[in-house]
């Protein structure tokens, strides 16, 4: 195991972390309205801010390096210090729609802070990994790293705080 040294029964990194704080959990759902009712009525989670994402809301939206136009509905709320994001795809081809078809509803990605967005993206490219999704939203660059093979989940990084976080709750 490169970059890791054993100390007693713990693994201790020998490099600086590329992920420093969990900011968001992205959950893909089939029906946003039904899911919101379940989250609010059954679990008391909310209030939620709802948005519709259209192709005009992103600059240079790409999936696996290919330019795409996608639409989806989103809802955001804060649970403690972590934003919960519900995502309903409005097309059949997006990474979210494919996730639903293959795995059903559930956690699609975890968004984390990273000390250097560009270096983290470059490191993935050096490993030969195409970004799952990337683009710019409200001036913030976002990238979904293909860490699902290594970590069992997609990691989202951004070069700023999501705009929705400033407006939720």
Predicted regions and their residues:
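Vicinal oxygen chelate
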Residues: 2-16, 27, 29-34, 44-47, 78-83, 85, 90-95, 118-169, ...
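N-terminal beta-strand motif that seeds the catalytic metal site of vicinal oxygen chelate
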Residues: 2-36, 44, 105-112, 167-169
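A short alpha-helix capping/helix-coil boundary motif
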Residues: 13-17, 53, 98-101
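Extracellular/lumenal glycan-associated surfaces
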Residues: 24, 28-30, 38, 80-85, ...
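Conserved short beta-strand elements that form part of the metal-binding/catalytic scaffold
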Residues: 46-98, 140-163
């Amino acid at each position: 195991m490169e970059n890791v040294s054993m100390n007693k029964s713990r693994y201790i990194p020998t490099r600086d972390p590329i992920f420093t704080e969990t900011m968001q959990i992205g959950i893909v759902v089939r029906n946003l309205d039904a899911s919101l009712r379940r989250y609010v009525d059954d679990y008391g989670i909310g209030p939620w801010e709802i948005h519709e994402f259209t192709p005009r809301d992103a600059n240079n939206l790409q999936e696996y390096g290919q330019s795409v136009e996608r639409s989806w509905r989103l809802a955001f709320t804060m649970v403690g210090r972590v934003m919960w994001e519900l995502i309903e795809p409005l097309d059949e081809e997006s990474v979210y729609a494919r996730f639903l078809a293959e795995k059903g509803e559930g956690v699609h990605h975890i968004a984390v802070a990273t000390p250097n967005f560009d270096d983290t993206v470059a490191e993935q490219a050096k490993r030969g990994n195409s970004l799952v999704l990337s683009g710019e939203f409200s001036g913030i660059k976002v990238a979904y790293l293909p860490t699902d093979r290594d970590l069992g989940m997609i990691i989202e990084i951004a070069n700023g705080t999501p705009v929705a976080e400033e407006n939720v709750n």
